[in-house]
UniProtKB/Swiss-Prot annotation:
Keywords for this protein: Chloroplast, Glycosidase, Hydrolase, Multifunctional enzyme, NADP, Oxidoreductase, Plastid, Transit peptide
Disulphide connectivity of cysteines: none
GO molecular function, one term: hydrolase activity, hydrolyzing N-glycosyl compounds
Gene expressing this chain: PYRR
Origin: domain of life: Eukaryota
Name of this chain's protein: Riboflavin biosynthesis protein PYRR, chloroplastic
């Protein structure tokens, strides 16, 4: 059965406009100058009411973008609101004909969902985007969706903060004759101040990651009215009330990982889960130099969540082996400190990290400039105690004038408690650092700028993110019955085939569950947990066939989307590495110790397309 040739990366065919220059703008843009004067980046005066409506709808787009919080792991938050003014009402809210948001990495983009909801009502309308499109490098569905929907104007809150994506979608839209107004450039009214703040806040993790090359880090603690986080004995359950603890669960759900120190494990034995049945569960990280930790602890139970122990190189190798037997990942550092751990979290692709540690580790993290925001829960209790611990240990400050003043402070009463939050480091606004079109790099599929370089890929929004199994590119491949089925991503296909062909109703149920997974993240979680919990349901030949299963899937993906093939060919001469620091089979590993089979399969496919190796060659023979 021939495979379809989609017009757009991941999008279903839709009524086409006359020109098709939008098909692959991210691949072929070569410093083109827009031929549409109306779409040029020049300020056009508008009425006060028009600006007010634009600002309100842009804030709504930012609110919509935040709807996946806690449901999936942190990712760039995209929201799209499509509106058309109605003659019978002045309420901008009633003008909305469609809206959508990015649910998770590798899922349909906000612009496509909003366009589908609006249908024909989108034609001639305005699309409000809190962030310039760019949820997957190499995929141009967002731009194509707006063009095909007949959108005539786009209002953008922020340019994309990542350099390899910044300005490209905006230029592609303008090249299609669509008017694009960017807050702070084309729209400079004071009315947009709050709208811009909303756009910055909803993507604070992405902005901090782009600016500082570490995840957005939040320090959270609960303390008594006299500033204690525990009694002198170390007992700390509970300082804050149930409602405040519920808010903490929300903070965890918004984080890739939760970090604690060894004392927290020894004294509190926490679980550090988000306490919900479905949704995102953060990784738990324990920092311990000595590894003087209990052999039995809630954090070693991986049924709740995954756990990483970060320690000094060489510490208690016998205990490391015991943790590894339980499935706990142990990561050694030459110098264990907050900055090193945050660099490691950055390499894992984390956007947001929550610190729930004691005062000593909190002080070290603040001193290392890796804490960006503080959430302090005050409880109306007094515990006293000369030796009772406080939220932050020694910072080396002797005068009050040296104190760190929090920025953009807010207060909220939560039942009997008070929540104070504020930033140590303000949210970076990268909008002043905007390259001209001539400075925006392009990818020419005909000429490779790489020779023998190593090209890394991992998260979909990173450069070459379309090489990831999580990229939003569906494939048509046979299912367990031999019938062609549209798998949402390569990851869905791969995880399901762990159980395909097993003569057991439970295995068949797992395949169906993975098929229906809303995101590749969810598909991976189902496949991995079922494989671990029910090894008898995994096909007996899985270890010998999984490489072939993966190769069939990625080969289908690249043959279905020609622009991805062009991108792959543009890397000729370079080594491709999946930059996973923890997956030592498919990825390259933290220090290059990984087998990098995904990168090797992509290089084999590249060589096969170029005709340098036969299709039957083993993966180990790939370039």
């Amino acid at each position: 059965m021939p495979l379809p040739q989609p017009l757009l990366g991941g999008a279903s065919p839709a009524p086409a406009r006359a020109a098709s220059s939008f098909l692959h703008p991210l691949l072929h843009t070569r410093h083109r100058v827009s031929t549409a004067p109306a779409a040029a980046s020049s300020f056009v005066p508008a009425s006060h009411s028009s600006h007010a409506n634009d600002a309100m709808l842009l804030r709504r787009a930012a609110d919509v973008a935040d709807r996946s919080a806690g449901l999936t792991s942190p990712h760039p938050n995209f929201g799209c609101v499509i509106a058309r003014p109605q003659l019978n009402t002045d309420s901008a809210d009633s003008w909305v004909v469609g809206e959508g948001f990015l649910y998770a990495q590798g899922t349909p983009c906000a612009e496509l969902l909003a366009s589908q909801e609006a249908g024909e009502h989108a034609r001639g309308g305005t699309a409000y985007l809190n962030l310039e499109p760019g949820d997957c490098f190499g995929d141009n569905t967002a731009v194509g969706s707006l063009v095909q929907a007949g959108i005539t104007r786009v209002v953008v809150g922020l340019r994309h903060p990542l350099k390899h994506l910044r300005g490209k979608a905006i230029q592609a839209l303008r090249n299609e004759g669509i008017q694009v107004d960017v807050v702070g450039e084309d729209l400079q009214s004071k009315l947009f101040k709050e709208a811009l703040k909303s756009c910055l806040t909803v993507n604070a993790p992405l902005l901090y990651r782009a600016a500082f090359h570490v995840p957005f880090s939040v320090l959270k603690y609960a303390m008594t009215a006299d500033g204690k986080i525990a009694a002198s004995s170390g007992h700390a359950s509970w300082i804050s009330g149930k409602a405040s603890r519920g808010r903490v669960f929300e903070l965890r759900g918004r984080s890739d990982a939760v970090i604690v120190g060894g004392n927290t494990v020894r004294f509190d034995d926490p679980r550090l889960t988000a306490r919900h049945v479905k949704g995102h569960v953060p990784v738990r990280i324990v920092m311990s130099q000595s590894l003087n930790l209990p052999e039995e602890a809630n954090l070693w139970n991986l049924n709740d969540a995954y756990t990483i122990v970060a320690t000094q190189r060489g510490a208690r190798r016998d205990f490391q082996r015991k943790l590894a037997m339980k499935g706990v990942e142990v990561v050694e550092f030459d110098m264990l400190n907050p900055r090193a751990v945050m660099s490691y979290c950055y390499d894992r692709g984390y956007l947001a990290v929550l610190w729930e540690c004691g005062g000593t580790l909190a002080a070290s993290a603040i001193s290392a400039s890796v804490i960006h925001k503080v959430y302090a829960f005050w409880a109306p209790k007094i515990i006293g105690g000369l030796n009772a611990p406080t939220p932050v240990g020694e910072l080396g400050m002797s005068q009050m004038t040296q104190a760190i003043n929090l920025i953009d402070v807010s207060y909220e009463q939560i039942d009997r408690d008070m929540l104070m939050s504020g930033f140590i480091e303000p949210i970076p606004d990268l909008s002043p650092v905007i390259p001209s079109v001539e400075e925006i790099p392009s990818i020419d599929p005909e000429v490779s700028p790489y020779e023998t370089n190593i090209i890394s890929f991992y998260k979909t929004w990173d450069i070459f993110g379309a090489f990831s199994n999580f990229s939003p590119h569906s494939i048509q491949m046979p299912d367990e019955n031999g019938d062609y089925f549209t798998w949402p991503t390569v990851e869905h296909y791969y995880q399901a085939h762990k159980f395909v062909g097993v003569d057991n109703p439970q295995a068949r149920d797992i395949v169906q569950e993975i098929k229906l997974a809303k995101s590749p993240e969810e598909a991976a979680r189902i496949g991995r947990t079922r494989q671990k919990g029910f090894p008898e349901l995994v096909r007996t030949d899985w270890e010998s066939t999984k490489i072939d299963v993966m190769y069939r899937a990625i080969k289908c993906k690249f043959s279905t989307y020609p622009h991805l093939t062009n991108m792959l060919l543009s890397t000729a001469g370079s080594v491709l590495v999946e930059a996973s620091p923890h997956d030592l089979f498919w990825g390259g590993g933290r220090e290059g110790e990984g087998l990098n089979y995904l990168g090797r399969l992509l290089m084999q496919l590249r060589s096969e397309i170029l005709g340098t190796v036969p299709a039957s060659a083993e993966v180990g023979e790939a370039d």
